[in-house]
């Protein structure tokens, strides 16, 4: 498939899917290792959110070079936003404007992203 299509990267089906999981998914690391040994292009893991840090770091060790984590990032941003709104409204009794509100969500999103960058060893790299 890789030779026929000339793709730049390959999203592999090794046990993850998009969206929210009930429980932690089972990743087929034997299949992932085989695929990584067979192709010379970067492997992609779709649906990395909810997979767990241990599974994700192992997936990187076994050849995954790009991981989609949108659900985890969005959940972190939403959680930070909700916490900030509850705390500020209770302690100061005031409402925030939209720009202030969005900033809290972005900060939560960034904190989660930094967590993953450190987890995968990509923090501080260019």
Which residue stretches match the model-derived regions?
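Short glycine/proline-rich, acidic loop/turn segments that cap or connect secondary-structure elements
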Residues: 73-94
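A near-ubiquitous, low-amplitude feature marking generic local secondary-structure context
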Residues: 18, 42, 64, 92-99
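Flexible, glycine/charged-enriched surface loops at secondary-structure junctions
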Residues: 90-103, 122-126
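Generic structural signal for well-ordered, non-membrane alpha-helical segments
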Residues: 28, 74, 78, 98, ...
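Short beta-strand/loop segments at the ligand-binding rim of alpha/beta enzyme cores
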Residues: 37-46
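Alpha/beta enzyme core
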Residues: 1-38, 53-62, 67-69, 82-83, ...
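Glycine- and other small-residue-rich loops at beta-strand/loop junctions that grip anionic moieties
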Residues: 21-24, 45-48, 70, 105
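Short, ordered loop/turn segments at secondary-structure junctions
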Residues: 15-17, 48, 72-74
């Amino acid at each position: 498939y890789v030779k026929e299509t000339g793709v730049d990267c390959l999203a592999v089906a090794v046990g993850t899917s998009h969206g929210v999981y009930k429980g932690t998914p089972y990743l087929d690391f034997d299949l992932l290792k085989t695929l990584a040994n067979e192709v010379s292009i970067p492997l992609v893991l779709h649906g990395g959110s909810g997979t767990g840090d241990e599974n994700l770091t192992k997936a990187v060790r076994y050849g995954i070079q790009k991981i989609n984590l949108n659900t985890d990032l969005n959940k972190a941003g939403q959680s930070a936003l909700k916490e900030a709104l509850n705390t500020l409204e209770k302690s100061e009794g005031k409402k925030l404007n939209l720009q202030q509100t969005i900033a809290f969500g972005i900060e939560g999103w960034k904190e989660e992203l930094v967590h993953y960058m450190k987890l995968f060893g990509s923090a501080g790299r260019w």
